[in-house]
């Protein structure tokens, strides 16, 4: 996937060597953007194999408004284990903010769907996970923050906005096209970004379907985009591999409510990636 490999090259060639919260050290850039036309295939990195099951179940978990890893673990997903407390709780992280902002029954996802259906020209179709009132105290442990009703981690993918392009009648288009732009304040390029691309591309496709729209673009905008010092070798290996054609994601066309999707409603076709590459998570 050229856009992703171009990002990797850009950071390796132009990045600033910096320290970081985890003590691992990074090479990073500030401000970068990638664009993916979803009509050209599903943007799933092919220069290493991704664990699609984790991507889908995590997104469904967000949409449920869940913040306990029990659902993830029951479905074989371990990507949040390092940050949960002894009960599996993570505090008011993504799902809580998306569906129950400040515990005041502000359901941003439901409000977004309503706005897309009734006022698609709106410039206010934004979902925010960045809530300063629940950001963790950096001097305290994950467990202490959760006990104090704070998030175990601040959101990396902070907020996203949707845009509906009117159909081009001269081209025979009958439906508007839905595009999504994500602002990601902090991006782990080797481990996190491939997941984030696939997750938000999939979310865009799901919302387009339930709003009777066609998927347009996924636009990925970064703040601090970084490569951890212990991931250089893995990314050089990816750069040495020839990208393969993008797969196609098929959604169950019977689903008309964003909250009715289940794991079996997604079928990825023609995904033929290079072998997986292991890398340590910076905690």
UniProtKB/Swiss-Prot annotation:
Its EC number is 2.1.1.45. GO terms for cellular component: cytosol. Keywords: Cytoplasm, Methyltransferase, Nucleotide biosynthesis, Transferase. DUMP binds at residues 21, 123-124, 185-188, 196, 226-228. (6R)-5,10-methylene-5,6,7,8-tetrahydrofolate binds at residues 51, 188, 282. Pathway: Pyrimidine metabolism; dTTP biosynthesis. GO terms for biological process: dTMP biosynthetic process; dTTP biosynthetic process; methylation. The keyword S-adenosyl-L-methionine does not apply. It is found in: Cytoplasm. The keyword Transferase applies. The active site is at 156 (nucleophile). One of its GO terms (molecular function) is thymidylate synthase activity. CDD domains: TS_Pyrimidine_HMase. It is an enzyme of class 2 (transferase). It catalyses: dUMP + (6R)-5,10-methylene-5,6,7,8-tetrahydrofolate = 7,8-dihydrofolate + dTMP. Homodimer. Catalyzes the reductive methylation of 2'-deoxyuridine-5'-monophosphate (dUMP) to 2'-deoxythymidine-5'-monophosphate (dTMP) while utilizing 5,10-methylenetetrahydrofolate (mTHF) as the methyl donor and reductant in the reaction, yielding dihydrofolate (DHF) as a by-product. This enzymatic reaction provides an intracellular de novo source of dTMP, an essential precursor for DNA biosynthesis. Belongs to the thymidylate synthase family. Bacterial-type ThyA subfamily. HAMAP family: Thymidy_synth_bact. This is Thymidylate synthase. The lineage of its organism: Bacteria, Pseudomonadati, Bacteroidota, Flavobacteriia, Flavobacteriales. The gene is thyA.
């Amino acid at each position: 996937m050229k856009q992703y490999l171009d990002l990797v090259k850009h950071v390796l060639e132009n990045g600033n060597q910096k320290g970081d919260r985890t003590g691992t050290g990074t090479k990073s850039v500030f401000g970068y953007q990638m664009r993916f036309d979803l009509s050209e295939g599903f943007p799933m990195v092919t220069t290493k194999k991704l664990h699609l099951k984790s991507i889908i179940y995590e997104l469904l978990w967000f949409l449920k408004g869940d913040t306990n890893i029990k659902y993830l673990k029951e479905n074989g997903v371990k990507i949040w284990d390092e940050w949960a407390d002894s009960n599996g709780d993570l505090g008011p992280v993504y799902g809580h903010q998306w569906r129950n902002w400040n515990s005041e029954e502000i359901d941003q996802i439901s409000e977004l769907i309503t706005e897309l259906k009734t006022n698609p020209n709106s410039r206010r179709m934004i979902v925010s996970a960045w809530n300063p009132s629940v950001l963790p105290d950096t001097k305290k442990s994950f467990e202490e923050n959760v006990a104090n009703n704070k998030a175990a981690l601040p959101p990396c993918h902070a907020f996203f906005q949707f845009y509906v392009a009117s159909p081009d009648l001269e081209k025979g288009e009958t439906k508007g096209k839905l595009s999504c732009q994500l602002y990601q304040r902090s991006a782990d390029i080797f481990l996190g970004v491939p997941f984030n691309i696939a997750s938000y591309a999939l979310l865009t496709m799901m919302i387009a379907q339930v709003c009777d729209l066609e998927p347009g673009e996924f636009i990925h905008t970064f703040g601090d985009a970084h490569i951890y010092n212990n991931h250089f070798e893995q990314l050089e290996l990816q750069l040495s591999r020839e990208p393969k054609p993008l797969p196609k994601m098929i959604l169950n066309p019977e689903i008309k409510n964003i909250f009715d999707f289940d794991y079996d409603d997604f079928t990825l076709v023609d995904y033929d990636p290079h072998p997986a590459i292991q890398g340590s998570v910076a905690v």
